[in-house]
Amino acid sequence: MITVLRINHRPYRDKRITTHVALTARAFGASAILVDERDETLENTIRGVISNFGGSFSIKTGCNWIQEFKHFQGIRVHLTMYGRRINDVIDEIRNSGKDVMVLVGSEKVPIEAYEIADYNVSVTNQPISEVSALAIFLDRYFQGKEFEFEFRGRINVQPAERGKIVKIIPDEIECLDLLKKYGASEQLIEHVKAVEGLALKIAERCNADKRVIVAGSLLHDIGRTRTNGIDHAVAGAEILRSENIHDSVVSAVERHIGAGITREEAARLGLPEKDYVPETLEEMIVAQADNLFAGNKRLRLEEVLNIYRKRGLDSAAERIKELHRRISAIAGIDIDEIR
């Protein structure tokens, strides 16, 4: 884990540059930033970015930087024009396997920073922006792997050769607005809210992505505004793609029928020939939470299995039973007992 320590921050002058230090820290793989001067505006700005664009990055201002740096349990790095060349030390720092704190100052860094640091590290031994120095250090530390990190937030920018492609993971209000836009009945809305409630409780125990759980649960039956057949999952996915909803939510909707539909079953049912079996943890939770409700009435697993078996759907019942077992194992409790 890498923590960035920003010192000599002056809220009245350095708001923009410290914001850029924080944004660079987040985007290039650091886990947190500590800032010496209290600055609520800066905290709100960065937390807004995290809320919209995702990640587990954190920010805290008003820290005693000397105490934080001195007592940090790991490797303490000070980025400075006067340090050792980055290429001479970066492998040693990375291969230590220890957490790292990177001190990023502005002008006139106190001598204590140099004395406390385990490594005074320079990028070029020339005057350079602290933002650039931090970006280069993190890139060398992660060896370019930071470009593979996935940030999943409400707003998700997609790679594009030209133009702008943005996909959204809608929040609860936006999901309900979408349902109303497509004419969802009150009965349907009551059902998806019930499913959301259970799915979130399961997600809490499984450390699942709650953004995807909320959106997937609330939108899983949006396709019923077009058809009440088994193809409503496919119809729902089509609606969400047209609304630029993130693929993680689209897949949860498309794969929520029972414990999924195999490619062979899809062909027999007249669905587009592909595999509709839930794969991610979030997809599995949405599917099973839906299985455990008839309308807004909660069912136990055995009741669900009996319904499927009476319809001659024994193999589907077994898949639902296995899905229930898998999620319960992750949750550490039989999800029948989660109320």
From Swiss-Prot:
Keywords: Cytoplasm, Methyltransferase, S-adenosyl-L-methionine, Transferase, tRNA processing. The keyword Transmembrane does not apply. Its main location: cytoplasm. Belongs to the aTrm56 family. CDD domains: aTrm56-like, HDc. It comes from Thermoplasma acidophilum (strain ATCC 25905 / DSM 1728 / JCM 9062 / NBRC 15155 / AMRC-C165). This is tRNA (cytidine(56)-2'-O)-methyltransferase. Specifically catalyzes the AdoMet-dependent 2'-O-ribose methylation of cytidine at position 56 in tRNAs. Homodimer. It is found in: Cytoplasm.
